[in-house]
Amino acid sequence: MNEILNTKDINAIGEFFIETWGCQMNEEDSEKLSGMLKKEGYIRTEERENADVIIFNTCCVRENAELKVYGNLGILKGLKSKNPNLIIAVTGCMMQQKGMAETIKKKFPFVDIIIGTHNLHNFPNYLNEVKKKDTSILKIQEKEDSIIENMPIDRKNSMKAFVTIMYGCNNFCTYCIVPYVRGRERSRTPENIEDEIKKLISEGYKEITLLGQNVNSYGKDLEPKVTFADLLERVNTIDGLERVRFMTSHPKDLTDDVIEAIAKCDKLCEQIHLPVQSGSSEILKKMNRHYDREKYLDVVSKIKKLIPNVALSTDIIVGFPGETEKDFEETLSLVKEVEYDSAFTFLYSIRKGTPAAKFEDQVPEDVKHKRFNRLVEVVNEISAKKNKAYEGKIEEVLVEGTSKNDENKLMGRTRTGKLVNFIGDKDSIGKLVNVKIIKANSFSLTGEEI
């Protein structure tokens, strides 16, 4: 494995601001950017106006994320005029798209650094070069390198942490741009993953979320071969670790071995995010998802049989090209059959460079929105019903801090990922406590520590 390039010659030290759009992988990338800059002596600020360096870590999964970047870059023009020494950097998946970096440079010539996802680890070097030579940098690395280990990381949370176990994706769903911007699947060795988790535990962390675009593909590129089920069992034996979660799973790769590992490993939380995208086999085929409705429901049945108290969540795309009313009704019926605890629902958004962008049978926007509203209504009704079942139960909660809505209450999550606001002792923050659920709300639970 490569080691991170180290620089110690940045002249003037100042404050930096990072804004992040997108998934948990992007969040962890931003934590690494922050870690690298803090190692160089920079201080993080939450105010753009105070920053000497502003970094936008971008997402391109949906058009809305890109529009936010354009809008925010426009706002920075005024800041740059007031402070010509301000350094503005743009990185992330959006920049990795073909021609996008050049487009950003043309529209926003005041941007100083534009890099992609594959050379993020060299950011301190690029920053140093810009400051020394009074120049701008546009460097998009087309091909991914081997995994960079031992990068400094500045984690936002002091008790829960993301640990990336693999990068990239080999699935090429017809609507998705991730394989083009994140590269092919590359797995970290189990030893490196274990070492990172052990270090986190020594720093007081209680809960780890194993991250990957498709964690169920973990280890296929390693020699000797290691499966995701193997990794889960290894991680479960680490002393001091309280909880383990993972995301995201691809249904086609969620094997019986993985389901069995979740069921028998006591530190594995009873929560699985299993994106279905559509309940129609016809649409799933057009999406290139490599499973049909029957296969997906079979996987769900196995999960519920071995993990009866499991909380399932999913992703659903509404209005994929060619989606008929019949296809949409099949999605609704699948949602009702599975009874998800929660679902992330999205309107289909054309992504340039993906096969689906060229499909001719695009669904009208008004039809998409009507279907979307119908779906959300069903999802919310089921979520409320699932939450209601917690009333009167005693649940283990990892206490994360005070409630955002009531400073007199604490907040945390159950093993199934339910948000709980409850009356309790502030000395419990950072600990696992038992909470009696006294009331179920639409998107959270209310309780009291016992």
From Swiss-Prot:
Keywords: 4Fe-4S, Cytoplasm, Iron, Iron-sulfur, Metal-binding, S-adenosyl-L-methionine, Transferase, tRNA processing. Catalyzes the methylthiolation of N6-(dimethylallyl)adenosine (i(6)A), leading to the formation of 2-methylthio-N6-(dimethylallyl)adenosine (ms(2)i(6)A) at position 37 in tRNAs that read codons beginning with uridine. Pfam families: Radical_SAM (PF04055), TRAM (PF01938), UPF0004 (PF00919). It comes from Clostridium botulinum (strain Loch Maree / Type A3). This is tRNA-2-methylthio-N(6)-dimethylallyladenosine synthase. HAMAP family: tRNA_metthiotr_MiaB. One of its GO terms (cellular component) is cytosol. SUPFAM superfamilies: Radical SAM enzymes. Residues 14-132 form the MTTase N-terminal domain. Its cofactor is [4Fe-4S] cluster. GO terms for molecular function: 4 iron, 4 sulfur cluster binding; metal ion binding; N6-isopentenyladenosine methylthiotransferase activity. It is found in: Cytoplasm. InterPro entries: Elp3/MiaA/NifB-like_rSAM, Methylthiotransferase, Methylthiotransferase_CS, Methylthiotransferase_N, Methylthiotransferase_N_sf, MiaB_methiolase, rSAM, rSAM_horseshoe. Residues 155-385 form the Radical SAM core domain. [4Fe-4S] cluster 2 binds at residues 169, 173, 176. Belongs to the methylthiotransferase family. MiaB subfamily. Its EC number is 2.8.4.3. Monomer.
